[in-house]
């Protein structure tokens, strides 16, 4: 007997394979979280569990279109919807033996462009993990020379206080710039990505200093959970000091305000 989750998975797969067959996904970007690479990963896992020759044939046709786009078009370069995410996805597909593809030439051709984009993004205040420089730093985490340049750019652009580093960045459409401690687009992603950087040749003292001082700022934003329903604001207390209610979606950018959920015993 199928579970509700299994029914939902089949429903998602049916829509994706139908749209692939009809060419409706051909114009999507190549990204991992918002693009064709994420779709391919889902479909590869789906066919592992639920083999279907017709769907496998549809996916093969889609892969041809995907690789043509990957090798012939320069679109977004970012982790979420662009080329860096596609490379991360291909690395995963190869590692999990879901796909065997040599993309080293493509990666080599884009390396300088991606790394230059990452450094310039950080220097211009766009360190954003999903849509800026940090996603590229994560992908090239073993390239010590590049990582050290990224660390230098981060420290150079930080606003420095008493054992505190903080950065201003875009807060979204019509919201200007401000401080953001969240994971997807904010300073928590700086801590997360830099914590992965352990390869030989990386300036560990600088890395640790940035992590420590960024954590100090994040922790300085803690609020009373009894009053607000959560421990931290969604972005920063500094952006709107007059705001009384700090409902939070700290963990991810796309969730609704879900802070009451952990206290709902019916969800246990």
Regions found by a protein language model. Name each.
Residues 257-268:
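Single conserved hydrophobic/aromatic residue that forms the stacking wall/gate
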């Amino acid at each position: 007997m199928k579970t509700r989750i299994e029914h939902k998975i089949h429903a998602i797969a049916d829509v994706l394979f139908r749209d692939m067959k009809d060419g409706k996904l051909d114009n999507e970007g190549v990204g991992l979280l918002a693009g064709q690479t994420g779709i391919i990963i889902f479909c590869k896992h789906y066919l592992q569990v639920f083999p279907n020759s017709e769907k496998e044939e549809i996916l093969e046709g889609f892969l041809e279109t995907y690789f043509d786009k990957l090798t012939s078009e320069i679109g977004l370069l970012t982790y979420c919807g662009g080329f860096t995410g596609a490379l991360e996805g291909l690395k995963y597909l190869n590692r999990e033996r879901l796909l065997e593809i040599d993309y080293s030439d493509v990666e080599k051709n884009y390396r300088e462009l991606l790394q230059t984009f990452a450094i310039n993004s950080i220097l211009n205040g766009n360190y954003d993990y999903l849509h800026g420089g940090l996603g590229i730093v994560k992908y090239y985490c073993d390239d010590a020379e590049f990582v050290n340049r990224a660390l230098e750019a981060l420290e150079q652009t930080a606003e420095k206080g008493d054992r505190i580093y903080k950065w201003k960045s875009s807060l979204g459409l019509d919201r200007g710039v401000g401080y953001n401690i969240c994971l997807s687009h904010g300073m928590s992603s700086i801590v997360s990505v830099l914590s992965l950087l352990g390869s030989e040749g990386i300036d560990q003292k600088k890395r640790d200093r940035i992590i420590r001082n960024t954590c100090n700022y994040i922790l300085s934003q803690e609020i009373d959970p009894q009053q607000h329903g959560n421990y931290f604001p969604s972005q920063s207390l500094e952006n709107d000091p007059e705001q009384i209610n700090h409902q939070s979606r700290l963990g991810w950018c796309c969730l609704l305000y879900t802070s009451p959920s952990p206290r709902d015993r019916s969800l246990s």
